[in-house]
Swiss-Prot record:
Lineage, top ranks: Bacteria, Bacillati, Bacillota, Clostridia, Thermoanaerobacterales
Organism: Thermoanaerobacter sp. (strain X514)
One GO BP: translation
GO cellular component, one term: ribosome
Keywords from the named record: Ribonucleoprotein, Ribosomal protein, RNA-binding, rRNA-binding
Record gene name: rplT
Entry-linked PANTHER family: 39S RIBOSOMAL PROTEIN L20 (PTHR10986)
Family statement drawn from the similarity comment of this UniProt entry: Belongs to the bacterial ribosomal protein bL20 family.
Keyword Iron: no
PROSITE patterns given in the database record: RIBOSOMAL_L20
GO molecular function: rRNA binding; structural constituent of ribosome
Claim: Cytoplasm is one of the keywords in the record: no
NCBIfam families linked to this entry: rplT_bact
Designated name of the protein: Large ribosomal subunit protein bL20
Function (record text): Binds directly to 23S ribosomal RNA and is necessary for the in vitro assembly process of the 50S ribosomal subunit. It is not involved in the protein synthesizing functions of that subunit.
Length: 119
């Protein structure tokens, strides 16, 4: 029985890795072993980055809401608490968009939150 060396499979796998490593500097884009290590690490960083992006955007939205709420005389935590007591469930992304693009609607939400905090 003839020996099978997986020539096609190996070549395809190596070409795939080198294609992913395109644009890397020096040996990282030319040599399979070095490129494989670089690609593995970059895929790991990409995975971590996708998780971090969600945290970063949430922090950005909260910062924007806080700035807009303080401009209307209420802190972020009291504003969110007032909205919860009022039964208004708008996510932070939408609140930050409203704070930037639709100030009148945001001001109405602030007034509603203030009313429900005092009640």
């Amino acid at each position: 029985m003839a020996r099978v060396k997986f020539g096609k499979v190996t070549r395809r796998r190596r070409k795939k890795i080198l294609k992913l490593a395109k644009g890397y500097w020096g040996a990282k884009s030319k040599l399979f072993r070095v490129a494989n290590q670089a690609v593995m690490k970059s895929l790991m960083y990409a995975y971590i980055g996708r998780k971090l992006r969600k945290r970063d955007f949430r922090r950005l939205w909260i910062t924007r809401i806080n700035a807009a709420a303080r401009a209307h005389g209420i802190s972020y935590s009291r504003f969110i608490n007032g909205l919860k007591k009022a039964g208004i469930e708008i996510n932070r992304k939408m609140l930050s968009e409203m704070a930037i693009h639709d100030e009148k609607a945001f001001e109405e939400l602030v007034n509603i939150a203030k009313q429900h905090l005092n009640a």
